């Protein structure tokens, strides 16, 4: 081939970022092509818009498909480079005068075909160099994809841990104030219990704050290690075929060792401290009422009155639930404009639920709106992500770092005090009190059950 044409051919198959032959090439919407790993590394810290390093155009593209044509052409170019390397005198067997085309997995050496069948190497594993090297590259690319997903997960966890660390002391202070306010409603002889409760809460808060800081530091270290290993694997893929085959085992061992070192996030949780007499103080405000039948659905099970209501949220228990995410809402038939009221709901060991009270205009919408931090919704919710369940309250949206109730949850509505309190009945403990609620009477009970 004419040398000028060869140079054009090689340039067309070269990534403009790493200046090597394409490795898992992708073409972005501006028309320029790059190695996928190079784009990943360049775009790692870009939230939404990314920029082409060639034309500087921005793109939102994230799900990129491999350019098969470019990939095959790059493979041919690497194979041509290998054949040029093997044609040198150093790669001709001195005994048999044949090209060393075989790679011995045991000795990590190049052999000609007769040598690979000799008594010395007969029991070893051999493979043709050009195909073995490309297979190893493909294996490394799969490891790199797995590593990148791990790095992205670590980054999400790091951001979450950073947010938790920044907000943790404020959350503990908020909880201390809620517990103190609850004890102020109790008899004076519980003063000593209150002091012990608050002191334990402060100590737990300080310990968890330290754990969060340590976890954040570990994740930052993991981030550097993961990125470094990703770059090492990329460089290994770009090595000449023989070098790649000889070093493959060592870098694979390093990769597997690194995965064992990646830190997992802390799931902070303050203990549920029981408050003596809490349930007795609420029982005097207990009410019975029903849900509106036309708003109920098959995932909220009613047994007479609200105090006997069960919420079922495990899709495995109901064959009628599809794989599509659905959210079911139901309202109480009664509405409240003033006074104090208390009721209980048996949640069991379920998740993906929310209940509380809402301003009446939510009912008038007559549609399944998203349950989020919108004004006029005063809810306690439980969501499951992977294997971990988290609690939250709304108005404003606050994650609650306390144990998930696994049986019955109580709600206390104080219209004049403008508060909504949630209690873990089994533990006789306060989950949280939403203060300064922007009530617009009438207020109605609301229940939500979501299935995935």
UniProtKB/Swiss-Prot annotation:
Keywords: Metal-binding, Zinc, Zinc-finger. A zinc finger (B box-type) spans 88-129. GO terms for cellular component: cytoplasm. InterPro entries: B30.2/SPRY, B30.2/SPRY_sf, Butyrophylin_SPRY, ConA-like_dom_sf, SPRY_dom, TRIM/RBCC, Znf_B-box, Znf_RING. Residues 269-452 form the B30.2/SPRY domain. A zinc finger (RING-type) spans 15-56. Zn(2+) binds at residues 93, 96, 115, 121. One of its GO terms (biological process) is regulation of gene expression. Transmembrane segments: none annotated. SMART domains: BBOX, RING. GO terms for molecular function: ubiquitin protein ligase activity; zinc ion binding. Coiled coil: none annotated. The keyword Zinc-finger applies. Belongs to the TRIM/RBCC family. This is Tripartite motif-containing protein 51.
